[in-house]
Amino acid sequence: QGNFLSERYNIPYLSSGHIFREMAKEKTQMGRWLKETINSGALVPDDKTLEIILTYLEKPEYEQGYILDGFPRTVVQAEAFNGGVDKVVFLDVSDKEALWRIAGRVSDRQDETIHAIRKRIDSFHEFTTPVVEYYQQQGKLVRVDGEQDIDGVFHDIKEELDKLV
């Protein structure tokens, strides 16, 4: 959905996961640590996540806006990033559907073992559900049925975001 939205609104799309996976390839202490953390299915701690994402977003290509996927994942991150958010799109998907979709992707990602996927889903409930509630209270949340087909999801997101422009 991020790529579709990027094309529609002509702003860049990036994901926190992609940023972390790229950094995890680096032959540095941080790269090795990130690789271990990601492969275990654990969340990168708030302080490191904020440092990495906020530094990354200082690049000139993001000055006019961006679509950011997978961040913030905790209330601490949301509070620290509050000024950088116009709307939050939440694709509402059951655990069963999430597991099915992730497990069904053709991927060579080392962080997509069944154990790591289940741990990520558990982490989502523990840490990210409060973020969804945080943005709901601020009136910034757009909740979309993520179990529809791709076109239906895009239509619903677009309908809400078009109200902003």
PLM-predicted stretches and their roles:
Residues 1-165:
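Glycine-rich phosphate-binding loop of ATP-dependent small-molecule kinases
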